Curated annotation (Swiss-Prot):
Chain positions found as N6-(pyridoxal phosphate)lysine: 215
Enzyme category, top tier: transferase
GO term, biological process aspect, one: L-histidine biosynthetic process
Protein name as catalogued: Aromatic amino acid aminotransferase
Protein family per UniProt: Belongs to the class-II pyridoxal-phosphate-dependent aminotransferase family.
Protein purpose: Aminotransferase that catalyzes the conversion of aromatic amino acids and 2-oxoglutarate into corresponding aromatic oxo acids and L-glutamate.
Length: 361
């Protein structure tokens, strides 16, 4: 007799992270190339002395430090095992069978999976020019809508919503619907496009900002994220939280990162400079790509996506495909970017997809 599982699990795909191939250049998962600062390493090492003890499940020290960092009260802060766990918690506290959760598409791949797992209905609104079509999202709101995700900058297309348009969108959403501004890549925004998302939290009780230590702060392997929200929402998030899921080592590392925030965020300038160099070189080679405000670029290659990815793998370069929509390429170290650009220029050349492994250039 087979185990009786929920019927809807049968056709629910598992989340597929970026591949790792030993010895290859991996620019598929939007990781920072920089390791932790010495002060962060020291905090991590010190925290291992107490790993036989359970971590602080209330995250008191970390919440106080985060509150100072964003100029809110600790009661406005919720900590999670990466911001992805907070996405799931936000769905759990708002949505169930018969409810709808709205998001752009393509956007963060986890949204529809988490929505379906909760028994709710995902409603995907097509992007316009690779960014959120906020008017179309407003038009898609129904009396069943409970939650709206705005991934900004958008993953995987790298674009950011105009700050003024975002503010008007938030103001137009009915106040009983939660609006989640998922800002995993906010530290890479330049060109005057940084939204006043925390100001929107102050103005609107239904707005939540999600941020993470996985990208600019370089703690992807330790899994720490946080939400800034109304205390009522924070309290509800605590009711569906998996206890102890942000470890004592993770908390210590996050606090040390906040102590060194200026130094860590200065590293993003180097990433942005490389982003500009890579984007310019790709356009010069003949690629079309939207302006990136993240630590990656988006190549909308359509039906050529899978060939590009396979040929890149032949050249020991791992990038991230999204069906037949396009390819996401992380901005890596300069030498990694050079290797990628060399391949990309050969691939797009007339008659070319670049030499396969073992072929001469």
């Amino acid at each position: 007799m087979s185990i009786r599982l929920r019927a809807e699990m049968a056709d629910l795909p598992a989340y597929a992270p970026g591949k790792t191939v030993p010895g290859a250049i991996k620019i598929a998962s939007n990781e920072t190339v920089h390791g932790p600062l010495p002060s962060v390493r020291e905090a991590i090492l010190k925290a291992t002395d107490l790993i036989n003890r359970y971590p602080d499940n209330g995250y008191l020290d970390l919440r106080e430090r985060l509150a100072k960092h964003v100029n809110f009260a600790p009661e406005n802060i919720s900590v999670g095992c990466g911001s992805v766990s907070l996405c799931q918690q936000l769905i759990q506290i708002t949505s169930s069978v018969g409810d709808e959760v709205l998001f752009a598409w393509r956007s963060f791949e986890i949204y529809p999976l988490q929505v379906r797992t909760a028994g709710a209905t995902p409603v995907a609104v097509a992007l316009r020019d690779h960014t959120h079509d906020l008017d179309a999202m407003l038009a898609a709101i129904t009396d069943r809508t409970r939650l709206i995700f705005v991934c900004n900058p958008n993953n995987p297309t790298s674009t950011v919503v105009d700050p003024g348009e975002l503010a008007r969108f938030v103001a137009a959403v009915p106040p009983h619907i939660l609006v989640v501004l998922d800002e995993a890549y906010v530290e890479y925004i330049r060109d005057g496009l940084l939204p006043d998302s925390l100001g929107l939290v102050r103005e609107h009780r239904n707005v939540v900002v999600l941020r993470t230590f996985s990208k600019a702060y370089g703690l992807a392997g330790l899994r720490v994220g946080y939400a800034v929200a109304d205390p009522e929402i924070v309290t509800a998030l605590g009711k569906v939280y998996v206890p102890f899921s942000a470890t004592s080592v993770s908390q210590a590392a996050a606090i040390a990162c906040l102590d060194a925030a200026d130094e860590l965020l200065a590293r993003t300038d180097a990433v942005v400079a490389e982003r500009t160099r890579v984007s310019d070189a790709l356009r010069a080679a003949g690629y079309t790509l939207p302006p990136s405000q993240a630590n990656f670029v988006w190549l909308p290659l359509a039906e050529r996506t899978l060939d590009f990815v396979a040929r890149a793998a032949d050249n020991r370069i791992i990038v991230r495909p999204y069906g037949e929509d396009g390819v996401r390429v992380t901005i890596g170290a300069p030498h990694e970017n050079d290797a990628f650009l060399d391949f990309a220029q050969r691939w797009i050349a007339p008659g070319g997809a670049g030499p396969r492994t073992g072929d001469s250039a």
